[in-house]
Regions:
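A conserved glycine-rich beta-strand in the N-terminal activation segment of trypsin-fold
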Residues: 41-51, 70-95, 127-129, 153-155, ...
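Flexible glycine-/small-residue-rich
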Residues: 63-67, 122-124, 134-136, 145-148, ...
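Terminal peptide-recognition signature
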Residues: 58-64, 87, 94, 98, ...
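Conserved active-site neighborhood of the chymotrypsin/trypsin-like protease fold
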Residues: 84, 91-179, 327, 332-337, ...
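C-terminal recognition in membrane/secretory proteostasis and scaffolding
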Residues: 1-25, 117, 221-222, 226, ...
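Active-site loop architecture of trypsin-fold serine endopeptidases
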Residues: 8, 80, 102-110, 151, ...
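Gly/Ser-enriched beta-turn/beta-hairpin loop segments
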Residues: 69-80, 108-111, 123, 133-139, ...
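N-terminal activation segment of mature serine protease catalytic domains
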Residues: 9-74, 86, 92, 163, ...
């Protein structure tokens, strides 16, 4: 089941008195624990989130996209609203984070990415045109910029300190209902979801109700601090069934800072191009027949990634087209998601051990990771 997308930089930074990062490093102010509505000294089963909601809601916006489309019997394309989601103001000068699938554009023949027109509706109802600074399909995040006064940036929390069972609050605009709050608990802090080509690595799972339109909204702790960006729900019906997911704010910080500075998120890459459609299917008879016709042998592995081409750091390593990637840093690689899990915490320049199959032999090499030149 496809979770992501199933629901729904220009140089604006002044050189004067601007921090390098949108997300400042430091310890955020803690306003204290949410008030228990049960006077019993034992752990209370419910909490009062009124203060948390008051702090977070003004920073959550509605995000509407408009595309030019031509209807039946129409000679010309007209602009229509084609999708909606939520977003979170993370900087008082107009930086908003939302989901990639909410505002994703398309790539032209010359490689230029074209984005739809995006309009943001603020907490007070004001509508403002937004510019897409950049998107990151790997994390399902996108960054917008708006020009407006008196914006309230949400306070940032720390997703690395989250614990299972901790109370959280989802804020967004589900099903067209603006400024909606739902409450639940953290069900898992490092949930891996191998969906789509990239998958969700170490996401936050919660039972707080997340419905269509919540995508890109805020997941907050009991103090109203941002701990995650709501991404999707695992439901075949498209309605909340108590399983929602969010991208940890610690990851969002890096992605947003990269997009604002460079126009894209920076990732380390191994420099191999593989046939994604064959990933996880090397034991399939038709897949094996196809590969055998290309490499002219049939004794290749039944697991791993079939390498179509090499570039960057893998050039000269001994790895060639027709080889199979077996392990990275001791972790078996059978799908693109397996590879993403291993590479995500790595940095550009890190040296990693790679085990691969070449012409009937298993070999190992150390490769220094380089920066990805693409946005996927």
């Amino acid at each position: 089941m496809g979770v992501f997308g199933a629901l729904q930089a220009d140089k604006w930074i002044s050189a004067h008195n601007k921090p390098d990062d949108i997300f400042l490093q430091g310890t955020p102010t803690v306003y204290g624990k949410a008030r228990s509505i049960n006077a019993d000294p034992l752990p209370a089963p419910s909490f009062d989130f009124r203060d948390a909601a008051k702090r977070a809601m003004p920073s959550v916006v509605s995000v509407d996209r408009f595309d030019k489309m031509r209807g039946f019997m129409e000679s010309q394309a007209t602009e229509r609203e084609t999708g909606t989601g939520s977003g979170v103001i993370v900087s008082a000068d107009g930086i908003i984070v939302t989901n990639n699938h909410v505002v994703a554009g398309h790539t032209t023949r010359n490689g230029t990415e074209v984005f739809p027109r995006v309009q943001v509706r603020l907490y007070d109802g004001q509508k403002v045109e937004a510019k897409v600074l950049g998107t990151d399909p790997r994390s399902d995040l996108a960054v917008l910029k708006i020009e407006a006064k008196n914006l309230k940036a949400i306070e940032l929390g720390n997703s690395s300190t989250l614990e299972v069972g901790e109370w959280v609050m989802a804020v967004g605009n589900p099903l067209g209902f603006d400024n909606t709050v739902s409450v639940g608990v953290v069900s898992s802090t490092k949930r891996n979801l191998p969906v789509g080509e990239q998958g969700l690595v170490e996401g936050i799972q919660t039972d707080a109700a997340i419905n269509p339109g919540n995508s890109g909204g805020a997941l907050c702790n009991a103090q109203g601090q941002l701990i995650g960006i709501n991404s999707a729900i695992a439901s075949g019906t498209g309605e909340s069934v108590g399983i929602g997911f969010a991208i940890p704010v610690d990851r969002a910080k890096k992605v947003v800072n990269d997009i604002v500075k460079y126009g894209k998120a920076k990732y380390p890459v191994l420099g191999i191009e593989y046939l994604g459609q064959l990933a996880g299917h090397l034991d399939d008879p038709q897949a094996r027949e196809y590969i055998a016709s290309v490499i002219h042998r049939d004794d290749f592995p039944t697991t791993g990634l079939y390498i179509k081409a090499v570039s960057g750091p893998s050039v000269g390593s001994g790895i060639t087209a027709g080889d199979f990637l077996l392990e990275v840093e001791g972790q078996k690689i059978d799908t693109t998601f397996d590879l993403n899990k291993v590479l995500l915490p790595k940095k550009i320049g890190d040296k990693i051990k790679v085990k691969y199959w070449h012409a009937g032999q298993t070999k190992q090499v150390t490769i220094a990771l380089e920066e990805s030149q693409t946005n996927i």
